[in-house]
């Protein structure tokens, strides 16, 4: 074996010595004299340009035959290779096969059709539909809604901070508002009805002393003209059952009773004096004239 051959010697183990002699048949050699030369080189170039190369599908569909030791070996069509196999993989498969199969695999890997297939498979983009379907099934259904990116989140945070700072009240304004609220609370606590001295009422009404000076019950009585001293709501802290009442009829009855007691007391006071007693003693005696 010559050193110019780039094929390793291990691939030719088990092959006869005249294997390469049979491949290179001297009877098929063409001499240089048989080649016609002429001035019509331009015509040949024009003719070759008009030729259309055969499609790759037809070349791939053809089967190839060659002779080895007087036997005809046919190379069958193989599956298209997606990835270009390295020389180490090819030679490893050749070592583990019989001699005839070794030759077929070797020539198949070195044939121009296999080179075209490898270049076609490596250069052309593969159809990733199957891989995409598998990945889709594995990963699961994903929504079409766009995921918020980091830039959006940071922009929203900065925007919200600016808006909150713009609409947030200043410290002076907040202190003034708190002071007004405290004053209102203090005023509501200090309010007291001038008639019954109550501090809890659903609504403050106008009285003789101005606005919000009477409670709700006393204010209604004042507007109707029936607010008297004896009237007190039952919830008033100054309510006395023997003196006050929240019913107008009872107040009138109490006044009539007080008037009657006042008249009897006045009569008793007048009759209990010394002059009235002397008059009652002398009443019915005959009077003497000319004494």
From Swiss-Prot:
Predominant location category: nucleus
Positions of the UniProt region annotated as Disordered: 271-291
Positions of GATA-type zinc fingers: 187-241
A Pfam short name: GATA
GO CC aspect terms: nucleus
Keywords: Activator, DNA-binding, Metal-binding, Nucleus, Transcription, Transcription regulation, Zinc, Zinc-finger
Localization of this protein: Nucleus
GO MF annotation terms: DNA-binding transcription factor activity; sequence-specific DNA binding; zinc ion binding
CDD domains: ZnF_GATA
Keyword Plastid applies: no
Free-text function comment from the UniProt entry: Transcriptional activator that specifically binds 5'-GATA-3' or 5'-GAT-3' motifs within gene promoters. May be involved in the regulation of some light-responsive genes.
PANTHER family linked: GATA TRANSCRIPTION FACTOR, GATA TRANSCRIPTION FACTOR 10-RELATED
Membership in a protein family: Belongs to the type IV zinc-finger family. Class A subfamily.
Name under which the protein is recorded: Putative GATA transcription factor 13
Native source species: Arabidopsis thaliana
Lineage: Eukaryota, Viridiplantae, Streptophyta, Embryophyta, Tracheophyta
Gene from which this protein is expressed: GATA13
